[in-house]
Amino acid sequence: MAHKKAGGSTRNGRDSNPKMLGVKRFGGERVLAGNIIVRQRGTHYRPGENMGMGRDHTLYALIEGKVKFTRKGPKKRNFVSIEPLEESQP
């Protein structure tokens, strides 16, 4: 004879691993070519000057410089660009 009531089952208990999305380098920060600026799903931020976009919509720097976030166009879309660093004169 059972001394414990049979336990029910649950349909919960699952969770997905974190995807580490978001802005990785903020406006004004100095970056190197190849640095990831934004990891995202879809194109919340769009690539501006001197930026590349990976097939998963990751934005990365194509040159060394400073990160700049802007809003452009009639729909005020977010663009991320890289401003080249001024070369110091010897």
Curated annotation (Swiss-Prot):
Q: Name one GO cellular component term.
A: cytosolic large ribosomal subunit
What Gene Ontology terms describe what this protein does at the molecular function level? structural constituent of ribosome
Keywords for this entry? Ribonucleoprotein, Ribosomal protein
Q: Which SUPFAM superfamilies match?
A: Ribosomal L27 protein-like
Which PROSITE patterns does the record match to this protein? RIBOSOMAL_L27
Q: Which Gene3D superfamilies match?
A: 2.40.50.100
Region Disordered, as annotated, extends over: 1-22
Question: Which GO terms of type biological process are on file?
Answer: translation
Q: Using the chain's own numbering, where are the disulfide bonds?
A: none
What the entry lists under Pfam families is as follows:
Ribosomal_L27
InterPro entries from the xrefs?
Ribosomal_bL27, Ribosomal_bL27_CS
* Family indicated by similarity: Belongs to the bacterial ribosomal protein bL27 family.
State the protein's name: Large ribosomal subunit protein bL27
> What organism is the protein native to?
Coxiella burnetii (strain RSA 493 / Nine Mile phase I)
